[in-house]
Amino acid sequence: MAATVNLELDPIFLKALGFLHSKSKDSAEKLKTLLDESLARGIDASYRPAQKDVEPPKISSTKSLSIKQEPKTSSSLPSGSSNGKVLAAEKLKKEAEKRPADKMKDATEGVDVPKKPRLEKPETRSSPITVQTSKDLAMADLSSFEETSADDFAMEMGLACVVCRQMTVASGNQLVECQECHNLYHQDCHKPQVTDKEVNDPRLVWYCARCTRQMKRMAQKTQKPPQKPAPTVVSVAPTVKDPLVKKPETKLKQETTFLAFKRTEVKPSTVISGNSSSNNVSSSVTSGLTGWAAFAAKTSSAGPSTAKLNSTAQNSSGKPAASSASQKPVGLTGLATSSKGGIGSKIGSSNSTSPSVPLKPLPPLTLGKTGLSRSVSCDNVSKVGLPSPSSLVPGGSSQLSGNGNSATAGPTGSITSKTTSETSSSTSASLKGPTSQESQLNAMKRLQMVKKKAAQKKLKK
């Protein structure tokens, strides 16, 4: 077993062990020199693989082992006492075992090569020339590396010109930094040459040609996108939204017209129940349904403020006062004149909404309804501007001068004279105290609330 172990060991390793365990003062230095020599040999062998004279040390290793077994055994006795030395020896063993493995590979390749004497091999390997060549190679590599690394470092740090890769600076050829990409350019290297004014002006922010192009493209792109979606928003959105927006408006208009007709039917019942609303309305009465629709819409849209005006307009004696021309009230004579159609009239009226009547043959209806309004008119107060029959001229237009309100009477003068005479006779009986004004206001408020609720319900539907 000892023989097999000895065959695997390297003579250099045995030398190193001898130096390690020796008590001489020079042993450390000798060990160091041996290490340097072995390293030099390893480098030399890697550079010159043609010299395949590795087998002689393999043969001579058996001889050297037999010679050096005695000092090894003698030196191994004191090694047991020092643990630190053993640890160091193990390290050296590991290093040395790696080297012989490489040498064994070379030995298998170079068996046929002619053998050289053992003494020449360590001399050639440990020659100082090989050490010098390795140093020269290392120095050359370092110098080239330093040169390249300096250039690369300058480029990485952005200290050199991007075009010519140099850091030289002259008076008219200074390095200028782009504020966008932070690359350095010589004034001459940059394609549109940079002027001294641009370099020396501290207020100027300089951009290279590439960055200026990119910034222009970006600016154009940012300008274009809002223009492109803008027409789509304008064209698409209204097409979707317009029918939705416009349809409810048209519906609302239709509903208001229909509501107007419905309100005309509702109002006579409110008049009969005593909840009369005082409304002053300006109307150009025409023949047919359109006149009635316009009349009813305007009566329904009049506010309670007109009622207050009419109620305050009467005198303390109970005589009705003249209504202002701007209010242009409509009264019972309007119903009579509207039956014949074609004569627009501005007429004095009572405050009651009795003229709003279901659509039927008008002249007989007006007579019947005037009687109805006369019977119910006890609840109504402050009838303003009722015309008197005394100044009525049949067939011609005349002023009903009872209270200064003008009324144009058509060919049906006899009917209007009858209705006005009946209503004027009823005014004296219908005038009451101020408490009825409050009831009128309350009735107005109720009516408006009812109208609003009805309109809201129809809108929801």
UniProtKB/Swiss-Prot annotation:
Location(s), subcellular: Nucleus
Bias (Low complexity): 346-357, 387-436
Protein's UniProt keywords contain Protease: no
Gene Ontology MF term list: zinc ion binding
Post-translational modifications reported in the UniProt record: Dephosphorylated at Ser-127 by the PNUTS-PP1 complex, promoting RNA polymerase II transcription pause-release.
UniProt-listed InterPro entries: Int12_PHD, Integrator_subunit_12, Zinc_finger_PHD-type_CS, Znf_FYVE_PHD, Znf_PHD, Znf_PHD-finger, Znf_RING/FYVE/PHD
Keywords of the record: Isopeptide bond, Metal-binding, Nucleus, Phosphoprotein, Ubl conjugation, Zinc, Zinc-finger
Pfam family, one: PHD
Domain of life where this protein originates: Eukaryota
Zinc finger (PHD-type): 158-214
GO CC entries: INTAC complex; integrator complex; nucleus
Gene3D superfamilies associated with the record: Zinc/RING finger domain, C3HC4 (zinc finger)
PROSITE patterns the UniProt entry points to: ZF_PHD_1, ZF_PHD_2
Annotated signal peptide: none
GO terms (BP aspect): RNA polymerase II transcription initiation surveillance; snRNA 3'-end processing; snRNA processing
Record's keyword annotation contains Transcription regulation: no
Record field: compositional bias (Polar residues): 300-327
Region (Disordered): 45-129, 300-371, 387-444
Per UniProt, location of the Glycyl lysine isopeptide (Lys-Gly) (interchain with G-Cter in SUMO2) cross-link in this chain: 68, 253
Subunit details: Component of the Integrator complex, composed of core subunits INTS1, INTS2, INTS3, INTS4, INTS5, INTS6, INTS7, INTS8, INTS9/RC74, INTS10, INTS11/CPSF3L, INTS12, INTS13, INTS14 and INTS15. The core complex associates with protein phosphatase 2A subunits PPP2CA and PPP2R1A, to form the Integrator-PP2A (INTAC) complex.
Family: Belongs to the Integrator subunit 12 family.
Xref: PANTHER family: INTEGRATOR COMPLEX SUBUNIT 12, NUCLEAR FACTOR-RELATED
Protein name: Integrator complex subunit 12
Organism, as annotated: Rattus norvegicus (Rat)
Taxonomic lineage of the native organism: Eukaryota, Metazoa, Chordata, Craniata, Vertebrata
